[in-house]
């Protein structure tokens, strides 16, 4: 800064290389940082208020949040855990993405290639190759290849493979069968059967035990409980 109040960047010799001699430290009340040159590698020690700074560990895990990924060890690799206790139980699972408060917190221990994004998404679930998006989506879903998108979608589906629940409370009441596709708000909310295809808001709402059904449209077979 010169006397006239102007600011300049650089040195009196613009071709001078960046060296330790012309770096500096800025004190700024909330922290102390190196000036950033080049790729910013000198910007260090920025805390995130959690168990880790924003650096991957030796196994390639990237973790941020109090208690997130707290049980990971030498065979827990290439995971991304962000949020309070996200992925807290994982001790051997790989290539998972858990984002949000308590996302996949309790029982995901060894599953691989899962995605849980949202408050308590997949909190008590397990398995591999599953996708949970939304608050409490797939809350207790276990198995493989499941998809739950929407608040409480597939919330209590405790097992079964290749289930798809899309919509607020879609297929939320549970069951253990697989190969069911439910799309629509409250569609199949109480459905516990297997190999069903339910499309439309409230379609198959009370289909508690029926299998091999196809219901299409708003309120389709809403009162049906056990037909197959």
Predicted features and spans:
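A signal for long, low-complexity, Ser/Thr/Asn-enriched, surface-exposed stalk/shaft
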Residues: 2-7, 20-50
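Short, surface-exposed charged micro-motifs
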Residues: 17
């Amino acid at each position: 800064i010169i006397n006239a109040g102007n600011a300049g960047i650089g040195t009196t010799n613009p071709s001078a290389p960046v060296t330790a001699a012309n770096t500096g430290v800025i004190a700024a009340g909330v922290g102390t940082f190196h000036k950033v040159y080049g790729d910013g590698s000198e910007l260090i020690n920025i805390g995130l208020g959690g168990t880790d700074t924003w650096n991957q560990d030796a196994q390639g895990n990237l973790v941020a949040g109090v208690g997130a990924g707290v049980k990971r060890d030498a065979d827990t690799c290439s995971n991304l855990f962000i949020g309070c206790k996200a992925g807290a139980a994982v001790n051997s699972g790989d290539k998972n993405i858990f984002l949000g408060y308590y996302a996949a917190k309790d029982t995901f221990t060894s599953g691989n290639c899962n995605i849980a994004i949202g408050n308590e998404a997949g909190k008590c679930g397990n398995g591999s190759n599953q996708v949970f998006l939304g608050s409490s989506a797939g809350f207790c879903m276990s198995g493989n290849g499941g998809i739950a998108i929407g608040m409480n979608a597939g919330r209590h589906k405790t097992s079964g493979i290749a289930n798809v629940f899309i919509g607020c409370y879609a297929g939320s009441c549970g069951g253990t069968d697989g190969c069911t596709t439910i799309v629509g708000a409250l569609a199949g909310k109480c459905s516990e059967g297997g190999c069903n295809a339910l499309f439309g808001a409230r379609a198959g709402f009370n289909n508690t035990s029926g299998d091999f059904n196809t219901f299409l449209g708003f309120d389709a077979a809403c009162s049906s409980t056990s037909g197959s």
